């Protein structure tokens, strides 16, 4: 899938996107036929164990993006630009976005509306595709005072509508809508010619994205209403590890089938 196919999908078919942070995650996502992979700054929460996304660095994200590209060579990959990788200056933002493209990303994602529209236009003008992100923007968690549903007040709706318009004019190819009231997300989707990708934004967006660890039931401590679990891998993994631990301690593993005879490796 390429930029043109993503844009042309609007009104014709839904887009699927999932986060991934490693070679094998990406490989499985591509095998499943997922349209787009987002190497999210949620890498900080899900892989590195940070409380939120703010501590994630460019260097950490670059490693994840390059691993994902190797695992999914034929899937459209978007790199999340981490906190302070694009806010300090336009020059630094362009440099950092370019670094993601060099290691294999097809596009980058930035949070914000009016405050980043000018930067988005410059990135696009320099040949770097950009995905927008409105609604709940996790990098602003300290300003907004937590993870709150957006679009509940007239002021919030006005800001979202303005953001969609400005991002579209700046040249984004798609916009993530996170934790937005369903009716407002529907209106935003209808107001723009670019696809919207929802996460906790209801049924009427042009596509959906979920975090790997949420949809596969790995992060069971986090159970927001908008997440649907398609597996219970945490239980399966813990059960397998318990079985391994038990078999090692009682001498059942390794068994005869797991050892080499005097001849060495099988030929």
Curated annotation (Swiss-Prot):
Substrates-to-products reaction catalysed: 3-methyl-2-oxobutanoate + (6R)-5,10-methylene-5,6,7,8-tetrahydrofolate + H2O = 2-dehydropantoate + (6S)-5,6,7,8-tetrahydrofolate
Pathway in which this enzyme or protein is active: Cofactor biosynthesis; (R)-pantothenate biosynthesis; (R)-pantoate from 3-methyl-2-oxobutanoate: step 1/2
Gene Ontology MF term list: 3-methyl-2-oxobutanoate hydroxymethyltransferase activity; magnesium ion binding
Subunit structure: Homodecamer; pentamer of dimers.
EC top class named in words: transferase
UniProt-annotated binding residues for 3-methyl-2-oxobutanoate: 41-42, 80, 109
Name recorded for this polypeptide: 3-methyl-2-oxobutanoate hydroxymethyltransferase
EC number: 2.1.2.11
Disulfide topology: none
One GO CC term, this protein: cytoplasm
Residues bound to Mg(2+): 41, 80, 111
Cofactor: Mg(2+)
GO biological process, one term: pantothenate biosynthetic process
Principal subcellular localization: cytoplasm
The family this protein is said to belong to: Belongs to the PanB family.
SUPFAM superfamilies xref list: Phosphoenolpyruvate/pyruvate domain
TM annotation in the entry: none
Active site residues according to the UniProt entry: 178 (proton acceptor)
């Amino acid at each position: 899938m390429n930029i043109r196919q993503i844009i042309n999908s609007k009104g014709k078919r839904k887009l699927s996107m999932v986060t991934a942070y490693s070679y094998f995650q990406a490989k499985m996502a591509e095998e499943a036929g997922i349209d787009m992979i987002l190497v999210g700054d949620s890498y900080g929460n899900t892989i590195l164990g940070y409380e939120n996304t703010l501590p994630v660095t460019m260097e950490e994200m670059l490693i994840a993006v390059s691993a994902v590209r190797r695992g999914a060579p034929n899937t459209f990959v978007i790199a999340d630009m981490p906190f302070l990788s694009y806010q300090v200056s336009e020059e630094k933002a362009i440099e950092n976005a370019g670094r993601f493209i060099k290691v294999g990303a097809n596009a980058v994602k930035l949070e914000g509306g009016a405050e980043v529209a000018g930067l988005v236009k410059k990135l696009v003008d320099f040949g770097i595709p950009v995905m927008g992100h409105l609604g709940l923007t996790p990098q602003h968690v300290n300003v907004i005072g937590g993870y709150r549903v957006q679009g509940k007040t007239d002021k919030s709706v006005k800001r979202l509508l303005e953001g969609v318009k400005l991002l579209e004019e700046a040249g984004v190819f798609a916009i993530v809508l996170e934790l937005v009231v369903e009716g407002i997300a529907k209106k935003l989707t209808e107001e723009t010619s670019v696809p919207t990708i929802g996460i906790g934004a209801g049924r009427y967006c042009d596509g959906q994205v979920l975090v790997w660890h949420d949809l596969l039931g790995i992060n069971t401590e986090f159970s927001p209403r908008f997440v649907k679990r398609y597996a219970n891998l945490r239980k399966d993994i813990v059960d397998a590890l318990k079985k391994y631990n038990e078999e090692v301690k009682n001498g059942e593993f390794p068994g005869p089938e797991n050892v080499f005879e005097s001849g060495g490796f099988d030929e």
